[in-house]
Curated annotation (Swiss-Prot):
A zinc finger (C4-type) spans 8-32. May be involved in the regulation of spermatogenesis. Stimulates CREM transcriptional activity in a phosphorylation-independent manner. Residues 39-100, 101-160, 161-220 form the LIM zinc-binding domain. Testis-specific, temporal expression is coordinated with CREM. InterPro entries: FHL5_LIM2, LIM_FHL1/2/3/5_N, Znf_LIM. It is found in: Nucleus. This is Four and a half LIM domains protein 5. GO terms for cellular component: nucleus. GO terms for biological process: DNA-templated transcription; positive regulation of transcription by RNA polymerase II. Its main location: nucleus. SMART domains: LIM. It comes from Mus musculus (Mouse). Interacts with CREM (via the third LIM domain). Interacts (via second LIM domain) with SPAG8. It holds the Pfam family LIM.
Length: 284
């Protein structure tokens, strides 16, 4: 190799007795090599010279001293890290920034650890406990109240009402009647035993009855049509001498004119208007 062949490929200065870099079978002095081929650091934007360590991740480059967590600035050299939105984060900062927070203790639920989810919130498994007995609930059935979450045994002991019919716990809903509580499916007509949930009903001696049973067993009967007089929804009726009539049935026994609000006479248990009763031997 001649002396001219031992010159820098770019500036042609002699490399004899100097440091140089061989690239693609060409020789370069250190200054030219750094100026032409060095990568630029993502952090400080300065060239990463040949005498510095070049750390590369996904075609991005850093000086060794610049390769740090974007949040806490601790070195990431030879340490695990996560890239998020073009930022490099150590695992601790990533967990604090991106992982779920425990609804109870407000601390980070670390990636890979077991977490419990309920109503859109997250808990550490050890924090998801019954408000009363403080035992972990895990995947067991639970009942939630404003004061917290409860395992079923503790909820029944502390809060539950018991059905007046079957004597079992009412966990939700229920019907209150005469200061007693029933399951919806246990609140039945005392006559025919059909469910009264979402049905109109009447009571007799503190027992509930559907309208059909109550009317059949207890309602007064119209002296004209003999059908029950229920009095529901504001229905009007007429009462006279221990007899009752639907208002639409209170008519003259002969001409059938309505006697509601009119004077009338009686004859042999018959109700007559004044005109029809004037020729009969009536009771005043």
């Amino acid at each position: 190799m001649t002396s001219s062949q031992f010159d820098c490929q770019y500036c042609t200065s002699s490399l004899i007795g100097k440091k140089y870099v061989l690239k693609d079978d060409n020789l370069y002095c250190i200054s030219c090599y750094d100026r032409i081929f060095s990568n630029y650091c993502e952090q400080c934007k300065e060239p990463i010279e040949s005498d510095s360590k070049d750390l590369c991740y996904k075609n991005r480059h850093w000086h060794e001293g610049c390769f740090r967590c974007n949040k806490c600035h601790h070195s990431l050299v030879e340490k695990p890290f996560v890239a998020k939105d073009d930022r490099l984060l150590c695992t601790d900062c990533y967990s604090n920034e991106c992982s779920s927070k425990c609804f109870h203790c407000k601390r980070t639920i670390m990636p890979g650890s077991r977490k419990m989810e309920f109503k859109g919130n997250y808990w550490h498994e050890t924090c998801f406990v019954c408000e009363h007995c403080r035992q972990p609930i895990g995947t067991k059935p639970l009942i939630s109240k404003e004061s917290g979450n409860y395992c079923v045994p503790c909820f029944e002991k502390e809060f539950a009402h018991y059905c007046n019919f079957c004597k079992k716990v009412i966990t939700s809903g229920g019907i209150t009647f005469r200061d007693q509580i029933w399951h919806k499916e246990c609140f039945l007509c005392s006559g025919c035993r059909k469910e009264l949930y979402e049905e109109a009903f009447m009571s007799k001696d503190d027992f509930p009855f559907c309208l059909d049973c109550y009317n059949h067993l207890y309602a007064k009967k119209c002296a004209a049509c003999t059908k029950p007089i229920t009095g529901l929804r504001g229905a009007k009726f007429i009462c006279f001498q221990d007899r009752q009539w639907h208002s639409e049935c209170f008519n003259c026994g002969k001409c059938s004119v309505s006697l509601v609000g009119e004077g009338f006479l009686t004859h042999n248990m018959e109700i007559l208007c004044r005109k029809c009763g004037s020729g009969a031997d009536t009771d005043a």
